[in-house]
């Protein structure tokens, strides 16, 4: 896929504008009120415990080394295409704070991230840091990294707010009434990032078809909608749309 040349200096500028860089799949950078948030970062060559599978078909538009100073890393759940050990280890010696769902802290501390740098949250909990508000909200999905210990950690969608802006990130989720509930309580949103690229009838409960993502954007009262969960890793089986 074509990649736009990114001006990191302009992206880092602290002003009242909302700046976004999509890194492919569900990873993106967010500059809100001058604070830099990195969401579900995966920079490895494969989103799998075995590097032969779910391989990246192109490099991200920015390398780890090119990233600006990251204030926060936000994680939706612990699947390999959203929580990447090698990427997390890059931040061991940095001061980045991690915002994660319940149970995910254990993964990070196992990878030598200091516990005091990690904030774990349950659905509907709120945390405020440096002018930025993080709200953990529901998602319809599941978790687990080995197929033996499913659903021992929580999965979540997220709201990120400043005084001027508000965004919503679905994480991985099937379509259900939680989008309407979130939209009624916290909408409208300047931008919503919605799972739209893993559509298959077998996975309807845990991923959205594009038309369902459009309905979710409507439920959330989105001003802008960015479809995510596509465009970076080898695709699996899809249901053809007619």
Regions found by a protein language model. Name each.
Residues 239-242:
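Conserved small/polar residues in nucleotide/adenosyl-binding loops
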Residues 108-122:
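Helix-loop-beta element that forms the nucleotide-linked donor phosphate-binding surface
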Residues 15-18, 32-37, 126-135, 161-167:
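Beta-strand-turn-beta hairpins that frame and shape the catalytic cleft
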Residues 94-96, 221-224:
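A short helix->loop->beta-strand "cap" motif at the edges of active sites that frequently abuts
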Residues 2-17, 23, 27-78, 85-90, ...:
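Pre-active-site segment of Zn-dependent metallo-hydrolases
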Residues 79-83, 105-107, 125-128, 142-144, ...:
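Active-site environment of divalent metal-dependent phosphoester hydrolases
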Residues 86, 141-220:
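Active-site-proximal loop/helix segments of hydrolase catalytic cores
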Residues 30, 40, 77, 134, ...:
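Divalent metal-coordination and catalytic microenvironments
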């Amino acid at each position: 896929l074509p990649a736009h040349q990114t001006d990191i200096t302009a992206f880092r500028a602290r002003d009242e504008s909302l700046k976004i860089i999509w890194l492919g799949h569900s990873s993106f950078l967010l500059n809100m009120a001058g604070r830099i948030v990195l969401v579900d970062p995966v920079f490895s060559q494969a989103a799998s415990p075995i590097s032969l599978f779910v391989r990246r078909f192109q490099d991200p538009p920015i390398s780890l080394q090119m990233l600006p100073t990251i204030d926060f890393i936000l994680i939706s759940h612990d699947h390999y295409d959203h929580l990447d050990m090698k990427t997390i280890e890059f931040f061991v010696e940095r001061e980045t704070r991690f915002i994660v769902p319940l149970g995910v802290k254990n993964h990070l501390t196992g990878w030598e991230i200091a516990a005091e740098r990690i904030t774990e949250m349950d659905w509907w909990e709120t945390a405020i840091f440096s002018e930025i508000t993080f709200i953990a909200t529901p998602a319809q999905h599941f978790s687990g990294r080995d197929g033996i210990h499913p659903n021992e950690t929580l999965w979540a969608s997220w709201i990120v707010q400043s005084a001027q802006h508000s965004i919503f990130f679905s994480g991985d989720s099937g379509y259900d009434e939680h989008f309407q509930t979130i939209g009624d309580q916290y909408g409208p949103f300047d931008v919503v990032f919605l799972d739209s690229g893993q559509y298959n009838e077998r996975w309807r409960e845990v991923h959205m078809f594009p038309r369902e993502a459009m309905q979710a954007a409507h439920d959330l009262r989105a001003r802008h909608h960015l479809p995510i969960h596509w465009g970076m890793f080898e695709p699996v089986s899809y249901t053809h749309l007619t």
